[in-house]
Every structure is written in structure tokens, then in C-alpha cells.
Amino acid sequence: MSTAARAVADLLAILVGRLQAASGDPELTRLSPGLAVALSIRSGGARAVLWIEEGRVEPAGAGIVADIEMRLGEGVLEKMLQVPPPPRHQGFTALQIANPDVTVEGDALGLARARAALERLFEMALAAPELAAPKRTRRIEGVTGRRITLNCTEGPLEIHTEIAGRKGAVPLVFLHTAGADARQFEAQMADSALGDAYELHAPDMPFHGRSMPPLSWDGAPYTLTADRYLDWVKAYLAQVVGRPAILAGCSMGAAVTLVCAARAPELLRGVLPIEPPYRSKGRINRGQNDVGVHAGLHNGAFVRGLMAPTSPEGYRRRAAWIYSQGAPGVYQADLGFYSLEFDGEEIAPMVDAARLPVVLLSGAYDYSATPEDGARLCALMPGARQIVMPDLGHFPMTEHPDLFAGYLDQALALLAAGPGAPSHS
């Protein structure tokens, strides 16, 4: 065996040792009920096979036919074992769908059933120390939940919203991501400094969280389009907020924030897309809504790898937990708007960022809406500005609220200063 081959084999042995060390982890056990799967990992000429069954991880015979084959290209192992691993190397799903030097083969539904276990396994094997950040003062008791009725084009819709902060101050409205709800912004809604400066809003969109389907719903598959989504947002801004607001949506919420800025700028005084996509293709898969897959396990795991490995584990768990509770088909249908319909190349030039201030926030560990995507959007909106967050992922407000707070403060200060020349940091 050559020196190079020996080095690869040694690195693979380190990775496999870490994966085996996760055997018996209580969370892994919770995420793998009924699972029995063989995983093969190849790098160069080295190969290892692991048997994963209901929380147990054991070596399997090298000659076994694996259910899932994972092939790591040159240099991938070294990056995976860095502390912290760089973007696109931080977890199983990041490696599978975002890393061009990795291939994963296996039955699609079998892979979907194993995703929760595999994501947790690789999360533990590639763990990094938590990144410290100044603690923010929060008062969750200051957040008030309300039930309201929106008069929308499709008829009246009862929704749940949360409101906090200084009544009558500049409105700051947070919009949640696909398949989730306003719990993602719990830390920002309770933030004392934000509440002193802004009137804070965080609604659950219809069919999400505590916003129930209308009684007139016939049970047909839920669908989301730009027109329907914008109608909901416009109704909330006009009927609940009642004056121009700063709109701060994340992911699909960022996409509709840009749509609103393009088509209804009179309702806004500032545009703050968090993790905005350019064209986020390939986000839909069968495991999100198939009777052969536990969608709660799958969908929570599918988003887990989008976060930074240095974000606090407890917050990352909460972010995934929200996704585990979505109604059947809602996440996948939301992605129909986010991943199939929304086109930043079409929408961004319609936003007049020279008159309406626009600041984009992009996390480096986000492979669904990357910093490069944000830069493309900025280039199409002269006057827009972008802040890159090198140590955060797709759910910055949820995965590490204290670290995100500084970036949010910076973005809000730029919005308050008015439109500006393009700048990227």
C-alpha cells in the first residue's frame, strides 16, 4: 500500500471509529425506530461497512452488499475531519446533496428512511466546539399570542400571530421558512433590545404552526404559489400592522419578502431577506411526503445539515424539532414555491433598492441559499447590500440567536440609514 493510500485508510478509520462511538446515543435511538441498514463508505481504495440498527452501530463484513454506498472524492475526508468542518462537509445531507465530490447511491425511499439516523451519526462524528457569542437579554413573557382573521382573496383566514416590543414603534415583521412556523423567531421576539426599538410581529402562515386550515378546506393537497403567499403577507401588513414595515423573511420567507418588495413596495419601509435564494433547485424529494417514510423524522433531518456545526446543539435540535411537527405535505408544497417557482433573476430586478432599502443576510453554511446566491441577487438590485455570516447556516435566527443578533443589529442599522451603494461584507 502506498503512503497516500495508507493516509486515506487511516483517515477513514478515524471517521469510522467516530461513527461507531455514536452507538447507543439516546438521540440516535429515538431517530431510528425500526431501522436496519448497511452503510458503505469508500475513499480512494479504502472501504468500510457499518451496520446501523435502532441506535446501534457496528462493523459489518467487508463483503456485504450495502444498502447505501457513499463515495468520498479526493480531499473530502481531510475536510470532514477538520474542526470545524468547512461548508458542504458538515453533515450527511450536506455531503449528499451539496458536495460535488461526494456520491451517495441507494434506494431513494430507503435512504429517506435512514436520513434521520445518518444525519445524527455524522453530526456526532464531525462535531465541533460551540462558537461563543455575547449573551442577549430576553424576556419571553413579553411576547403575546393572538388569534386574528385575515380577509384574503380566497376568503377569511384565521391565523395565529405573536406580537412583542414597543407598540407604535417601527414595525419589524418576521416570516418563517418552508414547512415551519414562527417559533423560529422566538429568540428575536423576546429580545429586549429589539423590543425597545421595534414593534415585533411573527405570524404563522395559514396551514402552519398554530394557524389552522380554514373550515372550508376540502382536504385536498395544500399548495403554495407566489400569488397566494403574497396575498397572505399583504393582508397581514395592511390589516394587522397597518403601516409600512420592515419585512424580514427567512428562506421561502425571504423569497416572498423580495416578491413583496417588487410588487407591493408601498407596504414596506425596509427589506431584510434572511438566507434569500437565487434559484434553489433540487430541494424536493419523495421522502418529504410518502406513505413509506416517516416525514417527521425525515424532514427534521433534511434541514439539520443546513446549519453550522458550531451552533449550539440544543438550538439546532429545536430547529429540527419544528420541522418534525409539520402537517403532511406542507413542507413539500412550500418548496414548490421556494424551489420551483421563485426565480431571483426575474424578481430581483423588479426591486427598486435605490429607493427602498434592502439588506440581505447570508450564512456560509447554507447550501440551499448560499452567499453566492445573495451576491447574485445584490448585483440585480443596485443599492442593495449583503452581509455574509461565516459561522451560520440556513436558520441563523434559530440555530444561534446570540451570534445572529449582532448581524441582525448591523442589518437594521443599514436599513435605518436608508438606501446605499452596493457593498458586500
Language-model segments: residues:
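Feature captures hydrophobic
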Residues: 1-145
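Alpha/beta-hydrolase fold catalytic core
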Residues: 113-116, 122-172, 195-198, 243, ...
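Flexible "cap/lid" loop of the alpha/beta hydrolase fold
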Residues: 258, 262-298
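Conserved alpha/beta-hydrolase catalytic His-Asp/Glu region
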Residues: 282, 296-353
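Conserved serine/cysteine hydrolase catalytic core
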Residues: 336-379, 388
